[in-house]
């Protein structure tokens, strides 16, 4: 059974593929069908488009558009009604080498319901409705503040986004006594109030458009400034109600946002970044054990653990893009597999014959199939956190935790 992580990975990969495709003319059809749309109504609409497209002046464009519409109508015969989230067709002749084109068909059942029926015939596929479904749902508002500076931002999934950084004009405390000192103190408080108002406006303008999507707001900073800022009327009530916690942190610039997220993720474990950090840190603890822990990394070691059904958890970087090339000897049928296509045709180790390329697969898809067969849990991690970047840069984007330490052959 496919995990939500894997479905999102496949969905994102499909959109990246579609984005790179182009037609010679306006020959690529994007058809979005909401779940409550009658298939018979869609077919009738396509018949009308077919009639209209018969008048296209360019012979090749007319031929290709009509072929695409026919292809969609023939496939719609297999649907009594759209799936629960709707149906999206991407069909048309895409440009290949030189002046050549080839028919391309992609049918997607999106992760979220399609809201609007749409038919577009263009030189590229229209992906806007689907791309909006990739937007991160795990969103938190971030504010770090003291009297000298403040930074407002978001945590979206595992990615920190800076909205604005501001330095204040609040002068340092005046140590001389007398009337001039009291007047100077009043000026300091006026300047501080103006600065807090400005930061409140920045936060209000940033957070309010997304207030329904924001899970919580965290405020951090040194001293009591953060409490004062929250208690007064600098933030809208809707935002105040979302404030989950306040944290003592040492910095109020961009590094302060990272420190705030670190503190928040320690106390609130249902955050996506918390879950990723916990998983990766567990793996790191295992590989550091001097007696040999359950941690495993490296493509060959991961595949061996999967094939022996000894991998409990597979960790994959969500930016990992590799293919596996399988070559077969025409004489003895031995095979060799590579994750980078060899520059020269490989030779068979037994009879020195030139081997033939018989299969080319996506590495992540292959690993997921093996994981499914082995009952292995699969987690995709991003490169937005330090831990996630470490999985990609130090371990090649693949890591795992075994069920038991395999016995070493004597």
Swiss-Prot record:
Keywords: Cytoplasm, Protein biosynthesis. One of its GO terms (molecular function) is translation release factor activity, codon specific. SUPFAM superfamilies: L30e-like (SSF55315), N-terminal domain of eukaryotic peptide chain release factor subunit 1, ERF1 (SSF55481), Translational machinery components (SSF53137). It comes from the Archaea. InterPro entries: eFR1_2_sf (IPR042226), eRF1_1_Pelota (IPR005140), eRF1_1_sf (IPR024049), eRF1_2 (IPR005141), eRF1_3 (IPR005142), Peptide_chain-rel_aRF1 (IPR020918), Peptide_chain-rel_eRF1/aRF1 (IPR004403), Ribosomal_eL30-like_sf (IPR029064). The keyword Iron does not apply. One of its GO terms (cellular component) is cytoplasm. It is found in: Cytoplasm. Pfam families: eRF1_1, eRF1_2, eRF1_3. SMART domains: eRF1_1 (SM01194). Belongs to the eukaryotic release factor 1 family. Directs the termination of nascent peptide synthesis (translation) in response to the termination codons UAA, UAG and UGA. PANTHER family: PEPTIDE CHAIN RELEASE FACTOR SUBUNIT 1 (PTHR10113). Heterodimer of two subunits, one of which binds GTP. This is Peptide chain release factor subunit 1. It comes from Picrophilus torridus (strain ATCC 700027 / DSM 9790 / JCM 10055 / NBRC 100828 / KAW 2/3).
